[in-house]
Amino acid sequence: MAPNDIISDMLTRIRNACAVRHPTTVVPTTKMTRSIAQVLKEEGFIEGFEEVGEGVKKHLVISLKYKSRGRQPIINTLQRVSKPGLRVYSNRKDLPRVLGGIGIAIISTSKGIMTDREARRQNVGGEVLCYVW
């Protein structure tokens, strides 16, 4: 059965895989999950990702990143902000800063999915999808 909220499903799979120190996790591929994975890779929270499978059965295999000693995950917290039942939007002036700039907020804008810093640079607002730190 397909989940209703694909973003929450993706974040939960990554969070659970980090908790048990798995090297990779698999999530269903959509344009949204691919874009979020790209932002996480660019910001250094994951090693990388690749698409496997064909047609409707495509999945993203996300390689998780850990600190060298003790295998501590780089991602401490993945927090969903905007949910299907309660959407959260922010204009360009009120974009959130996560932990004073240490973490990132992933924003869905009219120019694509990007971090809060990139949205400020491009002077756009949008839907606040999640916080990562």
From Swiss-Prot:
Q: Key word ATP-binding present in the record? A: no
Assigned GO CC terms? ribonucleoprotein complex; ribosome
Please list the GO terms describing molecular function.
rRNA binding; structural constituent of ribosome
* Any GO BP annotation: translation
Would you indicate the residue range of the signal peptide?
A: none
Known InterPro entries for this protein?
Answer: Ribosomal_uS8, Ribosomal_uS8_CS, Ribosomal_uS8_sf
Matches recorded under Pfam families: Ribosomal_S8
Judging by the UniProt lineage, the source's domain of life is: Bacteria
Keyword Transferase listed? The answer is: no
Which UniProt keyword terms apply here? Ribonucleoprotein, Ribosomal protein, RNA-binding, rRNA-binding
What is the similarity comment for this entry? Belongs to the universal ribosomal protein uS8 family.
Cross-referenced NCBIfam families: PRK00136.1
Protein's job: One of the primary rRNA binding proteins, it binds directly to 16S rRNA central domain where it helps coordinate assembly of the platform of the 30S subunit.
The entry describes its oligomerization and partners as: Part of the 30S ribosomal subunit. Contacts proteins S5 and S12.
Its protein name is: Small ribosomal subunit protein uS8
